[in-house]
Amino acid sequence: MDVDVIGIGAGSPSHISLEAIGALADVDVVFALDKGDAKADLLAARQAIVDKHAPHVELVAVPDPPRDRTPDNYGAVVRDWHQRRAELLADAFVAHLGREGKRRGAFLVWGDPSLYDSTLRILQRVRDLGVDVRSRVIPSVTAISALTAAHGECLNQIGKPVLITTGRRLGERTPGTDAVVMLDGGAAWLEHADPEEEILWGAFLGTELETLRRGRVGDVGEEIAELKKELRAEHGWIMDIYLLRSGA
């Protein structure tokens, strides 16, 4: 059976590419992991894309199994979570696509499928369960490019590397290394960034809720941390990303 992985950009409906629209037109069923009422906006955004570009497509929501968000053994917990997701999705594929492969499925992935997204790994786990899944992968606008564009800045400084990491791993960064930080459930910059570093922060990029802040960590770090708490409390969820960089 065929299950495509289609990048839909960082949040704006305009981020979806002509290639992605063409791929979506070939699809019969879009699968989505349903994260509950707190993140219903994410499911609604996918439904809006389907309604606009491929109204013939059925959206199937598969309940996302819960997991511990602050585990002692992060890797083992996430691998177990991915396995449980794969088992649920394997059943959904068979139920809605059929083993004979006459229907085509897809996932609509925020940002680009290659960057801090688990869909491709989970599909491999589905294959390991004995379900023959073939996938096209359609790239798209990343949260990184949406962040730098929103701030009107280049990602890298001349002759300097950029680390892409998570909030959980920010403390392992070599001092002075510029870094893009994703999947920060808290405010790791308060503990692991130099007060003299500049932070370029954005939340809900590309949406009507887009919120941007920038400045020295020592000047705006606490403000951004409080703002992030307020936005999460107001909307029930938040997607944010930031760039930390030292002086040129």
Regions found by a protein language model. Name each.
Residues M1-V133, R214-E222, R232-A248:
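Class I S-adenosyl-L-methionine
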Residues V3, R173-A248:
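A contiguous loop/helix-start segment that scaffolds small-molecule binding in enzyme catalytic cores
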Residues G11-P13, R168-R169, D184-A187:
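Short beta->alpha connector loops
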Residues A25, D51, R127, A149, ...:
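Alpha-helix boundary recognition
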Residues A32, V60-P63, V137, Q157, ...:
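Structural signal for conserved beta-strand scaffold positions within catalytic alpha/beta enzyme cores
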Residues D37-A40, V141-S145, A188, T207-L209:
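Short gly/pro/ser/thr-enriched loop/turn and capping motifs at secondary-structure boundaries
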Residues P65-P71, I144, L170-E172, G206-L209:
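A short acidic, often aromatic-flanked loop/helix-cap motif at beta-alpha or helix-coil junctions
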Residues W110-T177, A233-G236:
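Class I SAM-dependent methyltransferase SAM-binding "motif I" and its flanking Rossmann-like core
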